[in-house]
């Protein structure tokens, strides 16, 4: 899901929160500041958080990713301690007996999970806001860095068959640099650990450099995989040619002597050159 932001991004990501707040634990999904994110909700405790947010849309929650996705009842040590504040935008209940729902969350500012204070009926915790250090977006250095990020991400999307067309559209149409950087971090097919290393960077410039290193590494891996695939295809083509040539020689043998006699292989290959196969 794509959403741009007009105006001073600090108004969105400078989040003030006091006291304990609901904590939503996610599996294999890392939220980033300013990014709108759809999320499938299936856990009963998570559904209770959503119902609370539906009653009061002003409720702000903390979203933290689990270190291991198979843990059903995460504790403090099971969560990465860097996450994002979020506010609910929309809830869509899914058909079926399982009662799952998809929620749309607006990412706000970054935060640190200091402690979990409750586990039932859902997780609650104490958090500390973390304000990213934003650069001068009008400086020549930052514009050059963003241009590099644009070009490298476009190459990554082109070579990654798993990336949806929406990503190309976003790259062209998100005008806010902070939102674009965080959108790339959130939506490229990086691992959770790679995304967390990006989120944990408190400087936007350093986050871009971390993202560029990951993008370039992935592009190199794509190139290696494609090279291996092309080489394998060439080897297979040569094997097929050799097989068809041997079959042709066999057929010529049968035509000339029903398989009898001792035609030289070179002569047979010469004779086969005029055949269609």
Predicted regions and their residues:
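N-terminal low-complexity, acidic/polar interaction/targeting segments
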Residues: 1-277
């Amino acid at each position: 899901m794509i959403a741009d932001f007009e105006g001073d991004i600090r108004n969105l990501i400078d989040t003030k929160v006091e006291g304990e707040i609901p904590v939503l634990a996610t599996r294999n999904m890392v939220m980033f500041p300013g990014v709108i994110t759809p999320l499938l909700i299936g856990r009963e405790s998570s559904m209770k958080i959503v119902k609370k947010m539906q009653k009061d849309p002003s409720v702000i929650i903390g979203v933290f990713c689990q270190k291991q996705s198979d843990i059903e009842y995460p504790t403090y040590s099971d969560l990465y301690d860097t996450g994002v504040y979020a506010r609910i935008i929309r809830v869509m209940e899914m058909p079926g007996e399982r009662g799952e729902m998809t929620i749309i969350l607006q990412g706000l500012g970054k935060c640190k999970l200091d402690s979990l204070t409750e586990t039932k009926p859902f997780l609650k915790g104490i958090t500390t806001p973390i304000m990213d250090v934003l650069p001068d977006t009008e400086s020549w250095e930052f514009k050059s860095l963003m241009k590099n990020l644009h070009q490298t991400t476009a190459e990554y999307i082109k070579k990654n068959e798993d990336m949806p067309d929406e990503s190309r559209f976003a790259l062209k149409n998100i005008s806010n640099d902070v939102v674009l950087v965080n959108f790339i971090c959130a939506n490229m097919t990086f691992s959770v650990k790679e995304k967390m290393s990006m989120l944990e960077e408190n400087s936007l410039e350093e986050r871009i450099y971390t993202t560029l290193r990951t993008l370039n590494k992935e592009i190199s891996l794509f190139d290696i995989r494609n090279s291996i695939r092309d080489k394998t295809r060439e080897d297979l083509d040569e094997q097929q040619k050799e097989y068809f040539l041997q079959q042709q020689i066999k057929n010529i043998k049968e035509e000339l002597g029903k398989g009898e006699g001792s035609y030289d292989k070179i002569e047979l290959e010469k004779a086969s050159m005029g055949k269609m196969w």
